[in-house]
């Protein structure tokens, strides 16, 4: 799909101009620098281009993230101001990304270009969702499940995202954060970056008990390991079936409870205010106030609608994930009522707090890799209807091993481009075990099960829909060389979840997670490093799909040994969460020479130029200097952001000191000494993205001014509206001495004044809806910038001068039109993007 031309109707730039390209990328790193391999195009962003006369053209970025402004007649002059804003609904989750002054950096949301005389120019700016941010040394959290007589006492472990290999052995073992005695058997996790704790939900699995607070319990554990877990809340009415505590190795009456009772997935809202959980028994979404140490009761309970299963009782919601300020709910139609494979399907809803919208429906009828052995055994190579009937119990076997993969959509993750990774758990492995006893009366034979979960991809399309792996433009990466010996007809985006060639072609255990700054999707797996009857994590390349089966030493981490685990190849791990972080904040932007002294950042020209080498100091609330920098060739500066020497404190009071006495004035008309610069009109116009923040000082060094600033109070937000405009003050001429009245009778002559009155234009009208001041960033409705429409739409249109002076100024502009090539423009983008 091609880039969209900016339009007012079909308008574009002057016929003598080159082509302007405005590109918006979604950033995930917050350094202010473009990452050419991981940043992705962002559609739907509003772009406005304004010429010196106030004429405007607008456009919206397309699927490539671009707006093209070709030559036309709507704009004149060749030098323009470009403003980018984030419209609804994107402004609910996207913010302006941090910018920088280094090589290959993102431009600010307000940028100045020169396409005069056929030159091409470009702007590349960034947006991001700060909720995506994680530190390079982030950790994963994974629950460990064990049988009642198992040797592993760990219930929650944490380990670095770089861990590979076998523990113990050639890799360090993870840190245990709590124990089986403290929380029992759990699955769901949600990490709280605001309070640095993990929520952990009880889980129904045969042969292994609930924790001390029962099957409806949600626990919290500090991630520093400094204290024991505590009960956070209970999900009302989540369980009815008790374990057989006197004979847990058989647990005969619990065969039908897994997947139908206790707690399914959990997710925390991006602002940390709400914890969501799925009540598997009632099929309801339960939400809790997550801001306190405990929650005495849910704040809301909502029915998750049946998507049209063969029978309403077949609907089994489970997985939860928050992405871009929406909650996604995954589940399956289990086909339990019909026992017909064609009734199996996966469904994903998007929930905005009011309604559930179906975003994915996928039949689960296709052939898969074999759980064990031959590719010709249908039961081992397909998903099967849910069934735990004791009357047909022996039909769950393939040979002497229980193999009957029954799908649960247990987890969801989203990649950088919005594609959806789905983790399917084999529900039957929560019914059987590895060495547990037959549930039927008078039969105590030990039984072994082999898990057959999966990891699948639904690729996002440019129109916001999804395509299943192997269809449309969503690749099938399975080949004889990568697929682990599975049948050639099997299509998989992630074919690397296998053990050996032709042994186990589906080793995924159903939990997935994805950190956007990394290149792999992590999945729970059995036998990840080729050691038998073990558990750990596999790492799947998000581009190629290759995983632990393709290179176990490089793509897997084993941390549950055969000796530790009572679940063996049935799998003994729960969900995966990662340690997200609060993204740093940033302030700053631009110092410019305001030749017309109107206080508005007009398109650059001979009288509107950036001011390099101005010294910018950041002072804290006590007046102490905490950071310093100088403006670059574009007049820009920034404090904060990822990797900055000084990390701004959210919501703190600061003062930005603009010492323009050091500025380079070589491009300023008449090249005055920097000490002659004075600050322009402050807070002019209605658009805080285009004004100057400094109230001109009246004493001391008049080229050294200050602007008070309150730093953004939410993680990852930026305020690129802290600007300073300067001009050269022209002294008023002295009042001439009155001419004595002649003594003759001749009438007195009326000489014209010695000079024109000084031109001090008033504030211009127009502007967007951002607040904060300066050449800014932000969404249409947010603080911290955003240019909106209007905003100093041309210095000629609203100068506040007399009609005569307007004509004089317009004549001067027309006379200088042919000298446009002499205007100073910002060249830095051309060689750096």
What kind of region is each of these model predictions?
Residues 2-10:
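C-terminal segment of classical bacterial N-terminal signal peptides
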Residues 760-810:
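Extracellular Ser/Thr-rich, low-complexity/disordered mucin-like segments
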Residues 54-55, 74-112, 644-708, 727:
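A short, solvent-exposed loop/turn motif at the edges and junctions
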């Amino acid at each position: 799909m091609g880039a969209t031309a900016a339009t007012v109707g079909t308008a574009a730039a002057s016929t003598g101009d080159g082509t302007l390209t405005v590109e918006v990328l979604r950033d995930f790193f917050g350094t202010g620098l473009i990452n050419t391999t991981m940043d992705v195009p962002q559609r739907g962003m509003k772009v406005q281009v304004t010429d010196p006369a106030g004429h405007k053209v607008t456009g919206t970025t397309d699927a490539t993230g671009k707006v093209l402004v070709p030559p036309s007649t709507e704009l004149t002059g060749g030098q323009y101001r470009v403003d980018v804003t984030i419209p609804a609904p994107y402004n609910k989750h996207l913010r302006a990304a941090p910018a920088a002054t280094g090589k290959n950096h993102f431009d600010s949301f307000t940028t100045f270009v020169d396409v005069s005389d056929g030159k091409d120019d470009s702007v590349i700016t960034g947006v991001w969702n700060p909720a995506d941010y994680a530190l390079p040394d982030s950790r994963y959290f994974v629950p460990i499940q064990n049988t009642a007589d198992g040797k592993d006492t760990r219930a929650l472990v944490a380990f670095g995202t770089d861990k590979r290999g076998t523990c113990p052995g050639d890799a360090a073992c993870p840190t245990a954060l709590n124990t089986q005695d403290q929380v029992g058997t759990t699955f769901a996790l949600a990490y709280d970056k605001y309070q640095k704790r993990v929520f952990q939900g009880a889980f129904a699995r045969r042969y292994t008990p609930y924790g001390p607070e029962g099957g409806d319990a949600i626990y919290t554990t500090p991630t520093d390991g400094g204290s024991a877990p505590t009960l956070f809340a209970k999900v009302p009415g989540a369980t009815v079936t008790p374990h057989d505590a006197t004979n847990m190795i058989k647990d005969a009456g619990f065969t039908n409870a897994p997947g139908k009772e206790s707690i399914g997935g959990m997710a925390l809202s991006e602002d940390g205010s709400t914890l969501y959980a799925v009540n598997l028994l009632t099929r309801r979404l339960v939400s809790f106030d997550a801001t306190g140490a405990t929650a005495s009761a849910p704040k809301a309970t909502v029915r998750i609608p049946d998507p049209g299963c063969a029978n309403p009782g077949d609907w089994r919601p489970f997985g939860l994930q928050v992405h871009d300020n929406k909650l996604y709910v995954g589940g399956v139609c289990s086909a339990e009522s019909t026992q017909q494979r064609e009734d199996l399907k996966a469904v994903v809803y998007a929930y905005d707090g009011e309604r559930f919208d179906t975003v994915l429906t996928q039949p689960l009828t296709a052939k898969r890799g074999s759980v064990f052995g031959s590719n010709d055994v249908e039961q081992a190579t397909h998903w099967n209807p849910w069934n735990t009937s004791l009357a047909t119990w022996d039909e769950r076997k393939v040979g002497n091993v229980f193999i009957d993969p029954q799908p649960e959509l247990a987890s969801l993750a989203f990649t950088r481009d919005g594609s959806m990774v789905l983790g399917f758990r084999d529900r039957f492995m929560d019914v059987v075990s590895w060495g547990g006893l037959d549930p039927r009366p008078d039969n105590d034979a030990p039984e072994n099960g082999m898990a057959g979960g999966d990891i699948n991809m639904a690729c996002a399309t440019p129109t916001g829909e999804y395509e299943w792996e192997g269809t449309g433009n969503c690749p099938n990466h399975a080949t004889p060389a990568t697929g682990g010996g599975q049948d050639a007809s099997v299509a998989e985006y992630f074919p690397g979840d296998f053990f050996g060639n032709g042994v186990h072609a589906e080793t995924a255990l159903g939990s997935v997670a994805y950190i956007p700054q990394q290149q792999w999707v992590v999945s729970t797996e059995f036998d990840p490093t080729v050691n038998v009857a073990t558990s750990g994590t596999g790492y799947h390349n998000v581009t190629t799909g290759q995983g632990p089966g393709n290179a176990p030493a490089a793509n897997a981490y084993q941390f549950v040994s055969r000796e530790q685990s009572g679940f063996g190849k049935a799998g003994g791990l729960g969900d995966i969460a990662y340690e997200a972080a609060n993204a740093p904040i940033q302030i700053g932007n631009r110092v410019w020479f305001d030749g017309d002294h109107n206080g508005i950042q007009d398109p650059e020209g001979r009288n509107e130029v950036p001011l390099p080498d101005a010294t910018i100091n950041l002072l804290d609330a006590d007046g102490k200097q905490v950071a310093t920098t100088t403006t670059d060739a574009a007049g820009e500066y920034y404090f904060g952001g990822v990797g900055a020497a000084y990390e701004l404190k959210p919501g703190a009071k600061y003062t930005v000191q603009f010492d323009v006495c050091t500025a380079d004035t070589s491009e300023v008309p008449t090249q005055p000494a920097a000490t002659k610069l004075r600050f322009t009109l402050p807070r002019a116009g209605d658009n805080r993205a285009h004004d100057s923040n400094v109230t001109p000082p009246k004493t001391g060094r008049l080229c050294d001014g200050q602007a008070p600033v309150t730093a953004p109070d939410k993680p990852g937000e930026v305020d690129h509206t802290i600007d300073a405009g300067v001009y050269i003050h022209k002294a008023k001429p002295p009042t001439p001495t009155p001419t004595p009245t002649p003594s003759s009778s001749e009438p007195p002559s009326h000489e014209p004044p010695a000079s024109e009155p000084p031109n001090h234009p008033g504030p211009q009208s127009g502007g967007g809806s951002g607040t904060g001041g300066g050449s800014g960033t932000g969404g249409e409705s947010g603080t911290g910038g955003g240019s909106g429409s209007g905003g100093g739409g041309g210095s000629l249109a609203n100068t506040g001068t007399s009609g005569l002076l307007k004509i004089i100024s317009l004549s001067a502009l027309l006379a200088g039109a042919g000298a446009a090539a002499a205007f100073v423009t910002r060249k830095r983008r051309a060689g750096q993007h």
